């Protein structure tokens, strides 16, 4: 049986369009807020509102999928995100945008959970690794193309919202031509997310997803603002964000291979150390291009390696619950990161963005160095 079946290809095609819309908004919303003369802490709170929506969406989607299936859940998630996009144009203000970004966050998280769960149920233990790799490549390619779009098109609010909303709705079209079945829904008793979070042997993976959420949430939410305060134009900000994301794309395959060959614990240690080096390089302002590249290559690949570490510790039928728990952990980190970092930037210096990233990475590195064990043979390849 082919790994990349027709439902899988159509699902990933729709995801690509949705990711383009998500990337454009994640870059431009902080800039639009800054243009409305909102303070740095307000920008951070709006970013955190989006990730709060991610948290709520992650918790709700399992129930939604069980009730209405993958296809309808995907349609519903897309409509919710489209509403969050269009709502930004109804009223410009801190409180209204706080609400609409929350709505967009719910829709975005639902899209992620639906797609990831559909891929998990479509695959087997032999091809889930390839499916997950394809998923992450599509996600990062869509994000990269979204950053390039920002550098090429008008970034005015009312110019962007119509086509971004249309792009979101277009992401529904591929799934109209196929049906994604949940063939494994009744094969095993459901596993709770809480039990996965409490699993002692998977703690390094869970902690890694939290740290990854803090790092990427801060970069996505506050990096455009950091560059804006440095006098970088909106078009150039899109370019530099594309550099950051392209490094993450290029790093996926080689880092995954290295983790398989040398063990995920060793690779995680090296990755976190490189994130610290990249943050220090950004603070030195010596060469932003290579600094952003190594920061993106190491930072954007933390989540899949940490996720693979945790998934090694569970049985085959627990993989979906574990992935939900890891996405929830990532979302919590994404929620905390921009909020606390924005407050530090507001009260002290914009450089606190990279000091914060380096600090939490150092804490995780200490956790990894304390682990003297070895990476066991995987229970399932995810």
Swiss-Prot record:
Encoding gene, per UniProt annotation: ycaD
Lineage: Bacteria, Pseudomonadati, Pseudomonadota, Gammaproteobacteria, Enterobacterales
Membrane-spanning ranges: 14-34, 45-65, 79-99, 102-122, 131-151, 157-177, 204-224, 235-255, 270-290, 291-311, 325-345, 348-368
Source organism: Escherichia coli O157:H7
Localization: Cell inner membrane
The keyword Cell inner membrane appears for this protein: yes
Predominant cellular place of this UniProt entry's protein: membrane
Keyword Cell membrane: yes
Top-level taxon: Bacteria
Annotated protein name in UniProt: Uncharacterized MFS-type transporter YcaD
InterPro entries: MFS, MFS_dom, MFS_trans_sf, MFS_YcaD, MFS_YcaD-like
Family annotation (NCBIfam families): PRK03633.1 (NF002962)
Residue spans, topological domain Cytoplasmic: 1-13, 66-78, 123-130, 178-203, 256-269, 312-324, 369-382
A molecular function GO annotation: transmembrane transporter activity
């Amino acid at each position: 049986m082919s790994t990349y079946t027709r439902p899988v290809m159509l699902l990933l095609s729709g995801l690509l369009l949705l990711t383009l819309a998500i990337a454009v908004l994640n870059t431009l919303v902080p800039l639009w807020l800054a243009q409305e003369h909102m303070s740095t802490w307000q920008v951070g709170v709006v970013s955190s509102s989006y990730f709060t929506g991610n948290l709520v969406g992650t918790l709700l989607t399992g129930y939604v999928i069980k009730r209405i299936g993958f296809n309808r859940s995907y349609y519903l998630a897309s409509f919710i995100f489209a509403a969050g996009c269009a709502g930004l144009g109804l009223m410009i203000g801190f409180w209204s945008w706080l609400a609409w970004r929350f709505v967009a966050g719910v829709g975005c998280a639902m899209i992620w959970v639906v797609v990831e769960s559909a891929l998990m149920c479509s695959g087997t233990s032999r091809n889930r690794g390839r499916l997950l790799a394809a998923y992450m490549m599509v996600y990062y390619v869509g994000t990269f193309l979204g950053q390039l779009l920002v550098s090429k098109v008008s970034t005015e609010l009312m110019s962007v919202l119509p086509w971004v909303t249309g792009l979101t709705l277009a992401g529904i079209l591929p799934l109209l031509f196929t049906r994604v079945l949940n063939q494994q829904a009744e094969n095993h008793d459901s596993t709770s997310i809480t039990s996965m979070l409490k699993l002692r042997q998977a703690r390094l993976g869970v902690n890694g997803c939290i740290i990854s959420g803090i790092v990427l949430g801060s970069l996505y939410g506050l990096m455009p603002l950091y560059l804006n305060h440095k006098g970088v134009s909106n078009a150039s900000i899109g370019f530099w964000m594309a550099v950051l994301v392209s490094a993450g794309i290029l790093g996926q395959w080689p880092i995954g291979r290295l983790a398989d060959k040398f063990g995920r614990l060793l690779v995680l240690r090296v990755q976190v150390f490189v994130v610290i080096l990249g943050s220090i390089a950004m603070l030195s302002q010596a060469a932003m291009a290579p600094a952003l590249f190594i920061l993106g290559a190491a930072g954007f690949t933390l989540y899949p390696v940490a996720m693979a570490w945790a998934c090694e510790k569970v049985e085959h039928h627990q993989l979906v619950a574990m992935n939900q728990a890891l996405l929830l952990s990532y979302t919590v980190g994404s929620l905390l990161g921009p909020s606390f970092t924005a407050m530090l930037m507001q009260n002290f210096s914009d450089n606190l963005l990279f000091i914060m990233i380096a600090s939490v990475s150092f804490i995780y590195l200490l956790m990894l160095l304390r682990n003297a064990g070895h990476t066991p043979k995987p229970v399932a390849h995810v």
